[in-house]
């Protein structure tokens, strides 16, 4: 298993058809998408956070999450992941679905500001975790609002920083 991970090769990605200017940025929740999917107050607050590192309120984070989710669903995403790059040179992710079972045979669609901003994944499967005590394996991922979210296949990738008990 470790050998397979170490010897893993990059996935070949086929370039889309047409001119790059026709598809450039279409799967990125950049400023143009933000302007379209966020109300003016939320858009201005997010730009202030991106440009000046101003903290977001819970209300604004909820509004950003709603707009980002709507954009992602309209672009074919059905899952989201907090995506980060550990010091191993690869990438790591924690996947979740926009729809969760409600316990009554249906589903709830949820993606709140709380889910966007911070997650508490079990880091025991990450390079810092496997041989640690459980409490030491805990890790946190926090959204990086200055890096735009993007879609790969059917997954919304939310750029994050990952922090673990051991660094």
Please place each PLM-identified region on the residue numbering.
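Divalent-metal coordination cores built from histidine and acidic residues
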Residues: 1-27
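ATP-dependent carboxylate/acyl-activation modules
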Residues: 137, 145-167
């Amino acid at each position: 298993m470790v050998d397979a991970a170490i010897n893993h090769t990059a996935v070949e990605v086929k370039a889309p058809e047409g001119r790059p200017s026709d598809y450039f940025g279409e799967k990125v929740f950049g400023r143009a998408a933000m302007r379209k999917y966020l109300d003016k107050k939320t858009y201005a607050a997010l730009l202030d956070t991106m440009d000046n590192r101003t903290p977001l309120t819970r209300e604004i984070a909820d509004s950003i999450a709603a707009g980002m989710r709507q954009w992602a669903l309209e672009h074919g995403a059905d899952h989201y992941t907090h995506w980060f790059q550990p010091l191993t040179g690869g990438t790591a992710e924690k996947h979740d679905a926009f729809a969760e079972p409600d316990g009554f045979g249906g589903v709830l669609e949820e993606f709140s500001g709380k889910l966007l901003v911070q997650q508490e994944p079990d880091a025991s499967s990450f390079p810092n975790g496997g041989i640690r005590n459980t409490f030491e394996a805990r890790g946190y991922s926090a959204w990086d609002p200055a890096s735009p979210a993007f879609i790969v296949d059917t997954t919304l990738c939310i750029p994050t920083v990952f922090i673990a008990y051991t660094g």
